[in-house]
UniProtKB/Swiss-Prot annotation:
One of its GO terms (molecular function) is calcium ion binding. Residues 268-303, 312-347 form the EF-hand domain. Keywords: Calcium, FAD, Flavoprotein, Membrane, Metal-binding, NADP, Oxidoreductase, Peroxidase, Repeat, Transmembrane, Transmembrane helix. The keyword NADP applies. Residues 245-256 are annotated as: EF-hand-like 2. This is Respiratory burst oxidase homolog protein E.
Amino acid sequence: MKLSPLSFSTSSSFSHADGIDDGVELISSPFAGGAMLPVFLNDLSRNSGESGSGSSWERELVEVTLELDVGDDSILVCGMSEAASVDSRARSVDLVTARLSRNLSNASTRIRQKLGKLLRSESWKTTTSSTAGERDRDLERQTAVTLGILTARDKRKEDAKLQRSTSSAQRALKGLQFINKTTRGNSCVCDWDCDCDQMWKKVEKRFESLSKNGLLARDDFGECVGMVDSKDFAVSVFDALARRRRQKLEKITKDELHDFWLQISDQSFDARLQIFFDMADSNEDGKITREEIKELLMLSASANKLAKLKEQAEEYASLIMEELDPENFGYIELWQLETLLLQRDAYMNYSRPLSTTSGGVSTPRRNLIRPRHVVQKCRKKLQCLILDNWQRSWVLLVWVMLMAILFVWKFLEYREKAAFKVMGYCLTTAKGAAETLKLNMALVLLPVCRNTLTWLRSTRARACVPFDDNINFHKIIACAIAIGILVHAGTHLACDFPRIINSSPEQFVLIASAFNGTKPTFKDLMTGAEGITGISMVILTTIAFTLASTHFRRNRVRLPAPLDRLTGFNAFWYTHHLLVVVYIMLIVHGTFLFFADKWYQKTTWMYISVPLVLYVAERSLRACRSKHYSVKILKVSMLPGEVLSLIMSKPPGFKYKSGQYIFLQCPTISRFEWHPFSITSAPGDDQLSVHIRTLGDWTEELRRVLTVGKDLSTCVIGRSKFSAYCNIDMINRPKLLVDGPYGAPAQDYRSYDVLLLIGLGIGATPFISILKDLLNNSRDEQTDNEFSRSDFSWNSCTSSYTTATPTSTHGGKKKAVKAHFYWVTREPGSVEWFRGVMEEISDMDCRGQIELHNYLTSVYDEGDARSTLIKMVQALNHAKHGVDILSGTRVRTHFARPNWKEVFSSIARKHPNSTVGVFYCGIQTVAKELKKQAQDMSQKTTTRFEFHKEHF
């Protein structure tokens, strides 16, 4: 085998007369270098006789360059040169030699023997043509290089020992945990000792179920200790622990498992570090090479489902070696890995996320409010509660008062009628409930008149009416309708009808005119117009309300076939159209009222006529407008994360605001289904774009129709700028109809000094348009070189509003909009389709107007050993190249879920005395947490957070 070239030279001082003693060992280099071995030898004494007694011998040094082949016992002399030496220089070289001494391998011993024989031969007595000055300079240079390398490495090692402290070790513990909340479960909240005992009991229980004949297989170790989704990583931990026992195990007993468990759950940093080191050090030589780091990186990437990182493991292994092994030894030791982990915070600070340094001034104490008394706390809490809910409160109060007034009015009216003497309070209760039903059947249509609401959003009514809660109000009214039906129908069937049937002749005379003088039977009452329409309405509304519930509409209810068709959006959509029949029956039912003969007493049509006409007009407008807004599909792209990107032609006269949404219909799939999607293009763009996550049956069918037989791997938004989409193909696609745009909470983003935009997965789409609009306006401002200070007009759809905001509620100043965007996704591939947005911000956001924060939840949190190495590679690569290893942009991707309390606290510190608009699109569970944090921070700081959730 060939010896690699050495990166330095050594010299040996001895008398030529004595030759080379076989006992003298050649120094093997710890450095990784080439097959060139510079050896410094003492040559012949020039004039031994010239020296007087007691004088020093002037020695001559010879530098010999050899190439050795240990395999075939051959040696090649590549070069030879003389170098002058003095005693002081020789002593320096001897000092270097002493520091470099170490045990030789078999190969180095054979080299020494070869050199000994060779140097004794007469051929080595040849003198060279080099001058004494050149030899002297060469020696100085080689000695300086050697000393520099050794000094630098030793200094780094000494510095690492000096900087190691308890506090740094404690911080490092958070970055190297084999057992944490992901393995022990979130329910464990007690102290560690108690927690560890509880966890071991769970491990014991899993051992009993997984073991066979009292032995646990190596492949089941991960599941047993809680690393369910990281089988390969757990096996590597298993092998590392087994190597400590000098064993190669395939199965372990319960006692051995307990020993392994104690090691991986040890709270000592040194213990965890040693396990992590042993995982990489597969050959147990106390050194980690580039290949071993690569293998550990691939294990970590596999455990975190990062296929792209797995492909680039070799590149990132070289990056780690470059950082930890600057001397190019070819390996790293335990102390170097320890240094990397202990300096985790320094690496993280060295690699900052994009635009985080700009923005408001951090005032950690000045914006905090610390009420001293309970009264002050309650007053502040009440104040925030009123500010957050006063719009909802007055609307609900007016609604409840209207229902109460109508109920009491009818109750008192029928108490004065003769029928009250027959049926008593059952009649008054039923009629009072009926009156509230008329009101609610009218009001329930208004929140779904989207065109009307969109227009009202542009008026001053938006200041006092919570249009964002239209769907919630629709649901509340529906619940009131259900209660009204129950009271009205229940009292009639259980109380009124039996009293009529069982009334005495004297009592029946009082109400005989309502029944044409004939006492009805129960069958007569049920088969009359009132009974048939009433029962039919109860049945139809029950079906519609049930299938519109969250569990049925979102497919959370699992039913056997063919009943499974009763769940999902389609079932909700079609059964809701049964309410058309209900309204027709309601008019008929209200016409054939008992005990009401005059036309003005039959008021049902008066309640519902205006809302019904308005709703019918809106549906008619949708039908007409959709034909006018028929669009051409310009580009279809299937993006990572099952996201379908559609770029369509912009219909003539189609105007919208950032944050609004549209309804899409594909007649090829269904002529009746309309589905809402947020607009992701900016108002100033020439195209109209949406991004659709293929989850339901309609979106799956849309993807099939648009992508069948076509290669759609191009990531449009990731490879083209917002203002000009590249290579748009005019392809013969199915027809799409567009209805809208419709108002959404996000369109009011200009009302705030600061924005906090939070999107989960595909929930980022409502905010893409806002970010584009902010950047487009910023670009226009730079071009025009002017700063708009006029009040923002709500009637403008293509706003000239740039970075100015309306007058701040705190102090009257107009402040530049600062946007903090948090995107949380669990699909590593989803980052690809959002890359264009991040790259555009990198290019255009020179003012630091927008902060981007990406969170990838498929990666274990920063405290998990499975993500520790990935986190370090990410920080090193970002610090060196300025690019994130996951997103491919300057925006660094965070791991696991955000700590929302810290997010809100940070924004409150940066923006004291400001109003922050919090806009969220995602699942309801996170919405509750965000709303709570917004309320808490509004009470504790001078920053006010106003929370808004997207509803479709």
